[in-house]
Amino acid sequence: RLFLKSGATAAIGLAVVPNTVLGKTYGHTAPSDKLNILGVGIGGRGSAVLDGLKSENIIGLCAVDWSYADHVFKKYPGAKKFNDYRKMYDAMLKDADAVMVATADHTHAIIAADAMAAGKHVYVEKPLTHTVYESRLLTKLADKHKLATQMGNQGASGEGVRQICDWIWNGEIGEVTKVEAFTDRPIWPQGLSRPEKGMKVPSTMNWDAFLGPAPERPYHSCYTPWNFRGWWDFGTGALGDMACHILHPVFKGLKLGYPTKVHGSSTLLLNESA
């Protein structure tokens, strides 16, 4: 809590102070020192992220599909349940220190921005936003409100990334002239057009909340969960899903800046799906 309130300078100091000096004998953290955290989008990746936050107070959880998120709600019986993040913010944001966002890509920016505008720190799953422009807006919000932020790019913290960077920087593999990066994505259904007919919205689903800023369309089970990644209105395709993992080591290791040229190709181009 002190770290979030005092910024990076205080954090550096706290990092080298033993727990006993801070009054946390044997590593025990008083309840008053724990962070109050809200989770938005908890059924998929959000569930794993929350597992890493178990040491803190998970006070509120929001999922647009309560059936998909039921196993997570059961993990945190003390957390209040919502199916619309706006209602959770209205009721609980004032009591929160930070918000975890792991919804479909197209709602990352608005959910994070609303929390940041209220002065709350955020952890947002990758891809950070649906568009580059949204990412720039969040950067401005973070600077304006002096917030701690993090994107969920777990691979960037792996030992393998640090090792390959050291190899490159130490010249152990010689001059790098070409890098090939590949992925098993997309592993969702491909080459789809929008369904001609919609389906009845499940009783456990808040479809309007899932759509968020996306254009209105009838509910269909092909959109969510998981497969939203393959629909442009909701996801960012294979590039948005995996480039942060497989290209980050390349950019870090070779210390690359913005690209000078990008070329893309596909055997099939569709307006609806990736």
Residue ranges, per PLM feature:
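NAD(P)-binding Rossmann-fold cofactor-contacting core
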Residues: I58-K75
